[in-house]
Amino acid sequence: MTSPDPLIATIRIAAPPTAVFPYLIEAPLLARWIGDATGSTPEPGGAFALAIGDSTSVRGQFLTVDPPKRVVFTWGVPGRDVLPAGSTTVEIVLTPDGPDTIVELTHHGLPRSEVASHQAGWTGLLDVLARVAAR
Amino acid sequence: MTAAAGDEPGPDVVLRALADPNRRQILRLVRGTELPAGQIAAHFANVTQQGISQHLRVLERAGLLSERRAGTRRLYTLRPEPLDQVRAVLAEFWPAALTQLKAAVERDNPPSGGTS
């Protein structure tokens, strides 16, 4: 069971999609905006691992890598009963707009309260959120 | 169903309630079931009954537990509604990350600007 309404975030970047795209898939560049990456294999089925804050590690797998337009990866927190690996997906679409790029990020599958009572897999999310909020 | 949506405690209260691993464990125990305090306490070897009572109060104040009287017993169960507020906190994570992405890309790709 997944959330019917995903989280969506967008931003405009003053650079073309070809300049933005590597930041979505390459470990040293992912580290610049999400968290320290300990590895990234940017191809369908390839895995990545990120450290957010001191003790939250995120594991994911690339599902779609379509440079310089679109990337889709799974997003999970291993060893927690929330956001188990593969339970949610993040889709990032790059659209050129003149010299700029519009970035649209959509996080699908996040648990919601209506399903929390019935669904294992939400309390680890809370661990993550508590840390995000504590920053 | 209790408490109208407008009466929800703020996300800070919810997050503080969730900051304690024992309290998160309590929520796991009462997810989808109702338990009296004694049975909840039985799951914790290192926490006194008093300590559990205190945790239950914090969780109730945060709106994360609902309480029902059954005879002489009080039964507790998860009340998940405040989690929507917490989800809203995650909704702030990605925009913040994208702002960092923008800063990184634009720092590395300065506009060609004037000549050259």
Predicted regions and their residues:
Chain B
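Short, hydrophobic-biased segments on the C-terminal half of alpha helices
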Residues: 56-57
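Beta-hairpin "wing" of winged helix-turn-helix
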Residues: 60-71, 77
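A cross-family signal for key residues in well-ordered alpha-helices
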Residues: 16, 28, 60, 66, ...
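N-terminal helix-turn-helix DNA-binding core of bacterial DNA-binding proteins
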Residues: 2, 12-48, 74-84
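Amphipathic alpha-helical dimerization/coiled-coil segments
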Residues: 1-10, 28-32, 83-116
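Alpha-helical interaction segments
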Residues: 65-67, 82-85
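Short hydrophobic/aromatic segments of transmembrane alpha-helices and their interfaces
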Residues: 7-9, 41, 66
